[in-house]
Amino acid sequence: MFEKILIANRGEIALRVIRAAREMGIKSVAVHSTADADAMHVRMADEAICIGPPPSSDSYLSIPAIVSACEITGAEAIHPGYGFLSENANFVRILEDQDITFIGPTSEHIRIMGDKITAKDTMKALGVPCVPGSDGGVPDYENAIKVAEKLGYPIIIKATAGGGGRGMKVANNVGELEIAFRSARAEAKSAFGNDEVYMEKYLTTPRHIEIQVFGDGKGGAVHLGERDCSLQRRHQKVLEEAPGPVIDAATRARIGKVCADAVARINYIGAGTIEFLYENDEFFFIEMNTRLQVEHPVTEAVFGVDLVREQIRVAAGLPMSFTQGELQVNGHAIEVRINAERLPTFSPCPGKVKVFHAPGGLGVRMDSALYGGYSIPPYYDSLIGKLIVHGRDRPEALARLKRALGELIVDGVDTTVPLFHALLQEPDVLSGNYNIHWLEKFLAEKLG
């Protein structure tokens, strides 16, 4: 087992990894920018080292700075958290060359799944159901017309190197195709430095269902059920729950086995998430995230496992501490992502937190790096906390979420907490009757 690991991240996920390491008797090293000198992850870690100025490009995304921090502190392994360098194949390849263990998959698996076309081709070959679409990238508008005619409208154009909704455009007819195609390419070039796009049939009312998988790197893999992440704004998840309100045990076992078998066949190591659109009882693969997800706590709650601990174990060469047969769904869990943003525009709201009080009680977990007197810097993502609740069933989890939101105090900055109070009044949310477009429509009607 490792004696010391470095966490190449900040905020609540850095704290999450520090906690798991401490329970395992492993020393932790926090890295931070000058803007994060007073951050909670810096205070909580056994050691801390400054890696650069506030901009992410000069600190949390600086591969030389992070590798140097590893060498200076003697850390044997790096946990990337999510975001930043967590899915950067070049970073992982450098660590492999330096004999520093990356707590996650191999650089090759990250590379394969990072290219959306290669990922789709790989998954299709492994027996995972995929959305009908173009064979590879679509080089020009003339080819786009042919692909759209073959698939039938509406179609969606996506960036090959994309994610997070960037470089993604919908065309409902041939009249909309040219503008959608050219703007998707331009957006992809701007966001990813690569203007290659591909096309898929656009599903009109799907849910976003993702399967948590975990591999040991030696041909063994399990699934830990699904999460429903359909409540989204601009392709960004807002609320996640497990199990999914519309997925029964037989469906879970079937699609879970397909996913576990797929990652087992490629000797995948560590945590991964296979994301699907789900419509008319059919699953369609969209992408695989080769890292821990923001929403991993809902899976931990219903399965009673520590996914970060498991990541560290398998990275150190130890076997998984559970088998598929031991993984049983227990109750229902819901997570809401709380951002420092001003409604109704969702504009970032950095500033000083005067008072912070986390809710408590049975089945309530708050993952946050906030504290009273902390100044939220303007340089990073606006996520300031995740409130996770667990109940014996979905109604109990919803009641617990409502109660916990009422206890949460973040004074000094605007947050998205009022949005969740509003959502918990909506019959569709309470019944689980929503798809990936529901929240956008709700916001347009209620917030104008």
Regions found by a protein language model. Give the residues of each.
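Structural detector of well-ordered beta-strand residues that form the stable sheet scaffold
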Residues: 29, 79, 101-103, 131, ...
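Internal, active-site/partner-interface "lid" segment
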Residues: 134-136
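N-terminal nucleotide-binding beta1-loop-alpha1 segment
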Residues: 159
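Acidic/histidine-enriched active-site and ligand-binding environments that engage anionic O-linkages
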Residues: 147-156
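ATP-dependent carboxylate activation and anion-phosphoryl transfer catalytic cores
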Residues: 7-24, 48, 71-73, 89, ...
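ATP-binding N-terminal substructure of ATP-dependent carboxylate-amine bond-forming enzymes
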Residues: 1-126, 138-146, 396
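A polyampholytic, Gly/Pro-enriched intrinsically disordered region
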Residues: 122-131, 153-154
